[in-house]
């Protein structure tokens, strides 16, 4: 299946208008327990695009259901599960889903682009973590030094 029909990761950053998402929600709710896979997928896609974390989480849950129950939709689900987890900050999960897609489609440009975004975020957060740990260590060293000097003066 060609990879050019998947959107680029940056497209997921622009949420649907509330009225557009409501159309998808209404259709999903209207179909109830007999909801079709396409309706569920469309609603999950709209939720993933949201800028509201609870909606993104629900979108990931719906996509997980589709991935588990409908093998013919797994390819699309892999990409959107990677995208949804990326937006939620679940970078290990995002990478896992994205890498699975890349195993089958190494030339998939959208998935390659998403891999770069995931790697950049992981690197930035890693650097932030190192900076925080370094700052805490420095502060502890300064406090320890001050206490040591204070104890030395009392002797």
UniProtKB/Swiss-Prot annotation:
UniProt xrefs under CDD domains: Fis1
InterPro entries the record matches: Fis1, Fis1_cytosol, Fis1_TPR_C, Fis1_TPR_N, TPR-like_helical_dom_sf
A Pfam family this chain is assigned to: Fis1_TPR_C
Mitochondrial intermembrane compartment spans: 149-155
UniProt keyword terms in alphabetical order: Membrane, Mitochondrion, Mitochondrion outer membrane, Repeat, TPR repeat, Transmembrane, Transmembrane helix
Cytoplasmic face residues: 1-127
Compartments where found: Mitochondrion outer membrane
Residues annotated as transmembrane: 128-148
Superkingdom, taxonomy of origin: Eukaryota
One Gene Ontology CC term in the entry: mitochondrial outer membrane
A GO biological-process term: mitochondrial fission
Membrane topology: Single-pass membrane protein
First and last residues of every TPR repeat: 75-108
Entry's family note: Belongs to the FIS1 family.
Domain writeup: The C-terminus is required for mitochondrial localization, while the N-terminus is necessary for mitochondrial fission.
Purpose of the protein: Has a role in mitochondrial fission. Has a role in outer membrane fission but not matrix separation.
Protein name: Mitochondrial fission 1 protein
Organism, scientific name: Tuber borchii
Gene name tied to this protein: FIS1
């Amino acid at each position: 299946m060609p990879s050019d029909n998947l959107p680029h990761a940056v497209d997921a950053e622009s949420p649907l208008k509330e009225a557009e998402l409501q159309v998808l929600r209404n259709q999903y709710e209207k179909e109830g327990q007999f909801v079709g896979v396409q309706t569920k997928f469309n609603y999950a896609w709209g939720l993933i695009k949201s800028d509201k974390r609870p909606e993104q989480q629900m979108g990931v849950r719906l996509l997980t259901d589709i991935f588990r129950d409908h093998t013919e939709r797994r390819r699309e689900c892999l990409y959107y599960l990677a995208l949804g987890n990326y937006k939620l900050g679940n970078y290990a999960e995002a990478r896992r889903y994205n890498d699975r897609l890349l195993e089958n489609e190494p030339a998939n440009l959208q998935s390659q682009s998403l891999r770069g975004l995931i790697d950049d975020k992981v690197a930035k957060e890693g650097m932030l973590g190192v900076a925080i740990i370094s700052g805490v260590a420095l502060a502890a060293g300064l406090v320890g030094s001050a206490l040591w000097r204070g104890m030395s003066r009392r002797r």
